[in-house]
């Protein structure tokens, strides 16, 4: 893998996916970020096994490839660099990083051990919604999701769609919050699913920086939801 990108774009991308990097884990590779260079873009991915975030930045690729690298060290290093072009060159298990007068070498780990992250390419969106109303919906209910892990189902936000109406609901045993929104999509199938409140909170933190509509996908096994923005 050999490529060139800007420090600004790489720094922003790492900042976005850092929310999904595992802090304490029995699977050490989830403390890494996945780097995958192909088709003129660098994909950066992170997961804590409950939530995953993918993001892409433009770059000039000389050699396609992929690897993983410790997220915290890599993020801090890129943040310390000046606003200039960055060269990334993977040599065996060493990632050689150059930015202006600065050179660094970081040890990598094979991407084969990185947990698979579901893709939306082969899926049709369950529904589409604009960032502003979606943010309002989340913020209107997320505060009353339970914190007590003894009843895991109450620590999530319930999504339900009936007659093209999206309803979000939370409850913690003392409070109940419900809000509904009429979707513009037609013929949306009726569906119910629960998203962990912690994961949905991270989605809401990205929404203010999103201009395009949000596409929500359910995986074929219906046990994972994908927010594409």
Per-segment meaning from a language model:
Residues 1-229:
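Structural preference for solvent-exposed beta-strand-turn elements
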